[in-house]
Amino acid sequence: MTGGTLQMARAAAAGAGGEAGVAVSLLRAAEAGAEDVLKADGYIFATPENLAGMSGMMKDFFDRTYYAAFERINGRAFLTLVCAGSDGRNAAQQIDRIAAGWRLKPIADPYILCTHAQTPEQILQPKMIEAASRARCEELGKTMASGLAMGIF
């Protein structure tokens, strides 16, 4: 809605896309389904923090795909990105718990970017993610892709 998470996801996808032999799909949670989960070798889950948790659309994605992928994607790599207004830890923890149920393996600690948006105006304002934060997301995407390409993950 305000663009912060999308900027983070695009940066991670750009980093991953530079690895030879790795195909990257950048999908919105509302558009992604069980087949997308099943055909991927790794996952970067990006969500805004909404009311101290992951977004409703991300929760809907997990609700729609969880059982279709259960016991079929064990051991695959994942990473969590959170664009938060104040904290983001609960959103990251929610995703980590779902990923643990899928028996996914984290490649890094969740990356939580805090925008410090605390008023309704700040929360609803379009976000401009700083270059250093986008670079960190790009680096994490590259790490994911490199690890997959080398068979580490």
Q: What are the residue ranges of the model-derived segments?
A:
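N-terminal beta1-alpha1 ligand-phosphate binding loop
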Residues: 1-19
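Charged catalytic carboxylate motif
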Residues: 4, 8, 36, 94, ...
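Short amphipathic alpha-helical/adjacent loop interface patches that line ligand
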Residues: 9, 13, 58, 141
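Generic secondary-structure signature for well-ordered alpha-helical cores
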Residues: 17-21, 67, 100, 104, ...
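A short beta-strand-loop structural module common to alpha/beta enzyme folds
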Residues: 19-33
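Helix-loop-strand module that forms the ligand-binding subsite of alpha/beta enzymes
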Residues: 29-114
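Glycine-rich phosphate/pyrophosphate-binding loop and the adjoining helix
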Residues: 33, 107-153
